[in-house]
Amino acid sequence: IGILGGSFDPAHNGHLAISKEAVKRFKLEKIIWAITKKNPFKIKSSLSLQSRIKGCKKIIKKNKFIEVKFYENKIKSNKTINLINYFNKNKKNEIFFLMGADNLVNFHKWHKWKQISEKCNILVFDRYGYKKKSLNSKTYKTLKSEKFKFVNFNKVNISSSQLRKI
């Protein structure tokens, strides 16, 4: 199972592209877009949770291998480690956490980031302008590189924050 967590504010074709690539390259059965009510590293979402969920469903359209889910009420947390622990209760699934190289740069600021890297595979999708920063990041230097699988990927050069500025 692949998990792409985020605020999806808004969801865009980059999210879809890395989901498709993860399924193709790593033979994943499905990808879960685990949407958060509030990203702890952002001030405020510009769209409501319901609007973001609706936007995600619109982007994925007929891609049945992607599910849009909101787990925070179920797990009583917006922390990635708690989501990973929730999925690890069912030991038959191998967990792959998907992130862009921009997230690896600040991954060491995430709650229990070392535990996250121990409990799942982390697929880091290259993003224009971030490869060097991510390879020089505290996270990458602190943890063994085998904790991360870098995916060379240059199909989409867009971010939700760029879209909000438009």
Each language-model region and where it sits:
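Nucleotidyltransferase catalytic core that binds NTPs
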Residues: 1-166
